[in-house]
């Protein structure tokens, strides 16, 4: 294990214990510890990566799928420290179900913050509203930013260099702050960790019908959209939009969704357009 991050983890744990593990205090504790001894000036990244590849004595590695990749460099029952490598330019707009602080170890990023206003819950895992940009800043190597859990801290990062690497000191999970929504601008929030296996299989089967040239593909999609609830209907349209456009069947299919859901359909149209554009 890397000695620098062991020391960082012990300092954070000691200070957090001194305030009885207050979740509200944790972002500030993590930020102060990162700024006292900035990893950007203390850690030699090439040496750390080579040591990680050779040394078997490492903290437990999660299967979070976050980062490209993620390295866990300190683990505690209440929090952990991760290094996140980023090879792609951008992250999705998202909120967190954890709190802490992150520090730019290498590279630089454009950090954008958002608010989600006029929220209309559709299900526990799907919301409608208005996503609004509230600020943008350039994060250069050495910058540290606090993370608060929940909808009060919605953000995205556009990484300007490859790789960009961030150090994250974070809790495992903050009770009552989920789901950890991802935002599809300008109007939809979805829970990316909610798994509806039946819908997933149906969308995969629709892909088969599309790729094999099924003549009734659009008719089948319209029948589904006419009977499904808003959430599953939206995901069906999202999955099939390009294929329907290529077949000249999109407008008729959209009309089925719009007729079924009335005024609420207005949230879906610009969001689906944005998904295609991106």
Name every feature range the model reports, one short phrase each.
Residues 67-87:
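A short glycine-rich, His/Asp/Glu-containing loop-to-beta-strand
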Residues 81-95, 148-150:
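Conserved short histidine dyad/triad with adjacent acidic residue
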Residues 92-93, 111-112, 135-138, 147, ...:
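Short beta-strand His + acidic residue motifs that chelate non-heme Fe in jelly-roll/DSBH
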Residues 98-117:
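Glycine- and acidic-residue-biased ligand/ion/polar-headgroup-sensing regions
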Residues 101-103, 155-156, 161-177:
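A short hydrophobic beta-strand segment most commonly corresponding to one strand
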Residues 103, 116-149:
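Short acidic-glycine-tyrosine-enriched beta hairpin
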Residues 167, 171-219:
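Charged, amphipathic alpha-helical linkers/stalks
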Residues 209-278:
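Intrinsically disordered terminal extensions flanking catalytic oxygenase cores
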């Amino acid at each position: 294990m890397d000695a620098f991050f062991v020391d960082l983890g012990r300092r954070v744990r000691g200070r957090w214990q001194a305030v009885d593990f207050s979740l509200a205090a944790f972002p500030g504790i993590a930020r102060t510890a990162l700024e006292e001894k900035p990893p950007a000036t203390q850690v030699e990244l090439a040496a750390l990566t080579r040591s990680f590849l050779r040394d078997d004595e490492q903290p437990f590695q999660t299967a979070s799928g976050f980062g490209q990749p993620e390295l866990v460099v300190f683990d505690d029952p209440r929090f952990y420290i991760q290094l996140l490598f980023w090879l792609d330019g951008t992250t999705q707009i998202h909120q967190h179900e954890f709190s802490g602080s992150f520090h730019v170890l290498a590279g630089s990023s454009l950090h954008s913050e958002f608010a989600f206003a006029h929220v209309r819950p559709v299900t526990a895992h799907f919301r409608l509203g208005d996503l609004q940009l509230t600020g943008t800043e350039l994060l250069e190597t050495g910058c540290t930013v606090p993370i608060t859990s929940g909808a009060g801290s919605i953000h995205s990062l556009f990484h300007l260099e490859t790789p960009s690497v961030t150090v994250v000191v974070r809790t495992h999970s903050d009770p009552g702050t989920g789901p950890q929504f991802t935002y599809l601008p300008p109007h939809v929030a979805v829970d990316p960790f909610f798994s509806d296996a039946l819908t997933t299989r149906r969308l995969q089967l629709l892909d088969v019908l599309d790729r094999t040239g099924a003549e009734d593909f659009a008719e089948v999609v319209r029948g589904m959209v006419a009977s499904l609830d808003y959430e599953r209907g939206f995901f069906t349209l999202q999955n099939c939009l390009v294929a329907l456009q290529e077949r000249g069947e999109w407008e008729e299919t959209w009309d089925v969704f719009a007729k079924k859901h009335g005024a609420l359909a207005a949230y879906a149209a610009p969001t689906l357009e944005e998904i295609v554009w991106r």
